[in-house]
Amino acid sequence: MSKILIVNSIYYTEIANLLLEGATDKLKGSNASYNVIEVPGAFEIPAAILFAVKSKHFNYDGYLALGCVIRGETDHYQYICKGVIKGLNEVVMHNTVPLGMGVITADSKDKALVRADKDKKNIGGRTASAVLHMIDLYNKLR
């Protein structure tokens, strides 16, 4: 049985709840257990995952990054998006861990809600499927 850590950014609560619902529904239908931790925003996701990867007290087979960044009127959106993607990529590349990237980047809250809703785009569920696939691949290639 695979054990997965879900790191959920709660900055946009409604979107966070939808992402988490999609992900946990998918994981409940698999042979995986999971724990959920919350972080304040998307930028904090890579650090939280790295904390868990480096922890001597926890051992996860894979990680799920859930969150949302919505474009505003300043460059902040671009910096946050680039920082999150770069941070997650560095965690994966430097620690060889399976990770599903479910951080929505959208031009509006309405577009983000469509992507998060499990009855529509279901990014949370898709990301859970991706991490399960990567855990299987990792175990086959080790």
UniProtKB/Swiss-Prot annotation:
Pathway: Cofactor biosynthesis; riboflavin biosynthesis; riboflavin from 2-hydroxy-3-oxobutyl phosphate and 5-amino-6-(D-ribitylamino)uracil: step 1/2. GO terms for biological process: riboflavin biosynthetic process. Its EC number is 2.5.1.78. 5-amino-6-(D-ribitylamino)uracil binds at residues 11, 42-44, 68-70, 101. It catalyses: (2S)-2-hydroxy-3-oxobutyl phosphate + 5-amino-6-(D-ribitylamino)uracil = 6,7-dimethyl-8-(1-D-ribityl)lumazine + phosphate + 2 H2O + H(+). GO terms for molecular function: 6,7-dimethyl-8-ribityllumazine synthase activity. Keywords: Riboflavin biosynthesis, Transferase. Belongs to the DMRL synthase family. Catalyzes the formation of 6,7-dimethyl-8-ribityllumazine by condensation of 5-amino-6-(D-ribitylamino)uracil with 3,4-dihydroxy-2-butanone 4-phosphate. This is the penultimate step in the biosynthesis of riboflavin. This is 6,7-dimethyl-8-ribityllumazine synthase. It comes from Wolbachia sp. subsp. Brugia malayi (strain TRS). The gene is ribH.
